[in-house]
UniProtKB/Swiss-Prot annotation:
UniProt record similarity statement: Belongs to the RecU family.
Keyword list, A-Z: Cytoplasm, DNA damage, DNA recombination, DNA repair, Endonuclease, Hydrolase, Magnesium, Metal-binding, Nuclease
CDD domains: RecU-like (cd22354)
Ligand binding (Mg(2+)): 81, 83, 96, 115
Record region (Disordered): 1-22
Biased segments, Polar residues type: 11-22
The protein's name in its UniProt record: Holliday junction resolvase RecU
Length: 198
């Protein structure tokens, strides 16, 4: 017996009311948007840019079954540098991605001294280096050249927050799109390379 339509619909209503709503992962995270953008650039033959893996040292592995090994304990082997690197039109690209819920600034404690040093080294080798900053509460995204990030960082050794006004003055706003989602190569081509490509 199906009990159409009343008992089925009332049962559904009761279960949906009794379950708490989970708002986790409602929107795509900024990093996932960058990964989707990089996949698009790769599929179109525009750039080859990948997320850098974080090196870990495995300490203990549990083998409940021979085919089901489980890492129980692991540590970071070394401090990571930046999130992404690759090649665009013959230029080496290296960048960090940061997202904040704050409305007026991004905390500089999110940038570590070894990351700043790495960015300085990339710039010394004529690489293209920058940070993509996403203010999730305003849905604003900026590309800030590493030079401007480093300059601000060295003012007080990364102790204070970088105001949004500074980012708007020295960075470039990126409007989200469909394909690619975060078209940062447009900013690189137009502003960092002056419209030239190899």
């Amino acid at each position: 017996m199906v009990n159409y339509p009343h008992k089925v619909s009332s049962q559904k209503r009761q279960t949906s009311l009794s379950q708490p709503k989970n708002f986790a992962n409602r929107g795509m995270s900024f990093e996932k948007m960058i990964n989707a953008t990089n996949d698009y650039y790769l599929s179109q033959g525009l750039a080859v840019i990948h997320k850098k893996p974080t090196p870990i040292q495995i300490v203990q592995v549990d083998y409940p079954q021979r085919s089901r090994a489980k890492i129980v304990e692991a540590y970071f082997r070394q401090a990571s540098t930046t999130d992404y690197s690759g090649v665009y039109n013959g230029y080496y690209i290296d960048f960090e991605v940061k997202e904040t819920k704050q409305k007026r600034a991004i905390p500089m404690k999110n940038f570590h001294p070894h990351q700043i040093q790495h960015m300085e080294q990339v710039l010394a080798q004529q690489g293209i280096c920058f940070v993509l900053l996403h203010f999730s509460s305003q849905q604003e995204t900026y590309l800030l050249p590493a030079f401007d990030l480093i300059r601000f960082y060295h003012q007080d050794k990364g102790q204070k927050s970088m105001p949004l006004e500074y980012i708007r003055e020295y960075g470039y706003e990126i409007k989200a799109g469909a394909f690619p989602q975060i078209p940062y190569l447009n900013v690189i081509k137009e502003h960092l390379l002056g419209g030239k490509t190899r």
